[in-house]
């Protein structure tokens, strides 16, 4: 299996509760390397662009409002099969359905305030990484 990169966000409910280190520990325990990371406060425009695929969904406004409600930590994670591996580590979008040992089972508050985002495919990972990081900010 090839080494891949995926894009991750530690969401405002995680920064608000000061649990970014606890989440990073689960990421690293799974064998993923944090090869880029920065704490930012997303603008409304950045959040709308990032979640444009969900524009027609009824929760879009709520999702954007939440993502700009406080700081987030954006990351690039690297490792074998990183995209699928991180989705396994995150657990189901709805924390009530997330498996034991996953980030969302341990930390997410609700389907909206679900602590983390991870890319769903190589194409989206490349687009999401490029939205927030220049090539020279990623150090593998
Ligand atoms: P994420 O992986 O960041 O991708 C899209 C996000 O939309 C998802 O995580 C959830 O946080 C959010 N989301 C999905 N379904 C709902 C919903 N029914 N209500 C509010 N937010 C949702």
Curated annotation (Swiss-Prot):
Positions bound to ATP: 11, 59, 87, 93, 104, 114
- GO CC annotations on file: cytoplasm
Give the signal peptide, or none: none
Q: Which locations, inside or outside the cell, does it occupy?
A: Cytoplasm
Name the coenzymes or cofactors required.
Mg(2+)
A GO BP annotation: UTP biosynthetic process
- What does the UniProt keyword field contain? ATP-binding, Cytoplasm, Kinase, Magnesium, Metal-binding, Nucleotide metabolism, Nucleotide-binding, Phosphoprotein, Transferase
* EC class: transferase
Which PROSITE patterns does the record cross-reference, listed alphabetically? NDPK, NDPK_LIKE
State the Gene Ontology terms under molecular function: ATP binding; metal ion binding; nucleoside diphosphate kinase activity
Annotated active site residues, numbered on this chain, are: 117 (pros-phosphohistidine intermediate)
Enzyme Commission number: 2.7.4.6
- CDD domains, alphabetized: NDPk_I
Give the chief site where it resides.
cytoplasm
Q: What does this protein do?
A: Major role in the synthesis of nucleoside triphosphates other than ATP. The ATP gamma phosphate is transferred to the NDP beta phosphate via a ping-pong mechanism, using a phosphorylated active-site intermediate.
Subunit structure, per the record?
Homotetramer.
Q: What is this protein called?
A: Nucleoside diphosphate kinase
Lineage, highest ranks first: Bacteria, Pseudomonadati, Pseudomonadota, Alphaproteobacteria, Hyphomicrobiales
